[in-house]
């Protein structure tokens, strides 16, 4: 299995490109099939989701370009900026991860949130688009190890999450 373990500069020429959903890009360990059928995984530090255009490398020198896979989302719009800010406030109060544009908010589909948003006076549309929510005010990550031994990164053996095929 090929292990993509190193983050590389985004201008590093890529040998292949693959698209992942935000949920997949948020994981620090993920097993996946390459287009040619070989098994691969990324094994990266926790706390920093992969973003569109990022590059990962293997010890063998193979470089993977990360793409954000389009996914079904709710897009919140209104012509009134204050109403949009109110909607963002109420979603934030519920710890909903948001992608914020100049005139819209995007979030994963949720019928309860859709009803709340409609009551606030915004329009809610279904869109299919790449999803890259805000990372949060504090940088979004729990970066230290709980190990008491220098060099031990994991308390227990890391688990790989699977997608696209048999486990």
Curated annotation (Swiss-Prot):
Residues 157-167 have a biased composition (Basic residues). One of its GO terms (molecular function) is unfolded protein binding. GO terms for cellular component: cytoplasm. The keyword Cytoplasm applies. InterPro entries: UreE, UreE_C_dom, UreE_N, UreE_N_sf. Keywords: Chaperone, Cytoplasm, Nickel, Nickel insertion. One of its GO terms (biological process) is protein folding. Residues 135-167 are annotated as: Disordered. SMART domains: UreE_N. SUPFAM superfamilies: Urease metallochaperone UreE, C-terminal domain (SSF69737), Urease metallochaperone UreE, N-terminal domain (SSF69287). CDD domains: UreE (cd00571). It is found in: Cytoplasm. NCBIfam families: PRK13261.1-1 (NF009751). Involved in urease metallocenter assembly. Binds nickel. Probably functions as a nickel donor during metallocenter assembly. Belongs to the UreE family. This is Urease accessory protein UreE. It comes from Nitrosococcus oceani (strain ATCC 19707 / BCRC 17464 / JCM 30415 / NCIMB 11848 / C-107).
């Amino acid at each position: 299995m090929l292990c993509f373990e190193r983050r590389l500069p985004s201008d590093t020429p890529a040998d292949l490109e693959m698209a992942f959903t935000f949920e997949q890009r948020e994981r620090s360990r993920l097993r996946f099939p390459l287009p040619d059928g070989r098994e691969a995984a990324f094994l990266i530090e926790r706390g920093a989701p992969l973003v569109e255009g990022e590059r990962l490398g293997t010890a063998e020198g193979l470089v993977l370009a990360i793409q954000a896979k389009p996914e079904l989302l709710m897009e919140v719009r209104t012509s009134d900026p204050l109403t949009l800010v109110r909607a963002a406030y109420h979603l934030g109060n519920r710890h909903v991860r948001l992608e914020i544009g100049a005139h819209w908010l995007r979030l994963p589909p949720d019928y309860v949130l859709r009803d709340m948003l409609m009551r606030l006076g915004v329009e809610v549309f279904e869109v299919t688009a790449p999803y890259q929510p805000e990372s949060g005010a504090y940088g979004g990550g729990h970066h230290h190890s709980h190990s008491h031994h220098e060099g031990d990164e994991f308390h227990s053996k890391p688990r790989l999450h699977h997608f696209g095929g048999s486990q």
